[in-house]
Amino acid sequence: MLNNKTILITGGTGSFGKQFIKTILERYQDVKKIIIFSRDELKQFEIKQQYPHKDFPQLRFFIGDVRDRNRMIQACEGVDVIIHAAAIKQVDTAEYNPTECIRTNIDGAENVINAALQCGVKDVVALSTDKACAPINLYGATKLASDKLFAAANNIRGSKDIRFSVVRYGNVMGSRGSVIPFFMQKKEEGVLPITHEEMTRFNISLQDGVNMVM
């Protein structure tokens, strides 16, 4: 499926991105190129150290921000598949930085869509969250808006051979922003808070999340 393809992953230095890269390299030895797009120079450097160019020449690194439309277009040139994982996803961070959350999660999604349409990308998969269902916070609201943008993009593609998809996750264990580290910390303190006695959390592993996308 992904052999001989060029894949761009936004937010590629995050928890999902790193697991995705690892999985692709293990399963698809003939992948043409994996472009790791993120604004975190240090994390890109760390991935370069983990995967030296002489051993993994298919890896490419692109410093950029999904809020920058022109940079997004540059990154998408020659790309077959986009995995859109870039987001502001910490609930409290989104609440205290609403403008940045909207620019990243909504405007960024629109930039990815427009770049994909302009550059002839074939498949776009956007990562989302169950918090987008009947959202009660800004993070969930922005992801709902993002999801609708990606779904609507299938109606404006015209004759272009491109497909836009959205994958909604529950709590991804092992990812940044997961509630699991918080619970582990509270366990050490001897107190485990419960948001609501009837609350249900849906958990998947990081690898399960990657498998759903692939």
Which residue ranges define each predicted feature?
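Conserved residues in the N-terminal Rossmann fold of short-chain dehydrogenase/reductase
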Residues: 38, 62-63, 103, 196
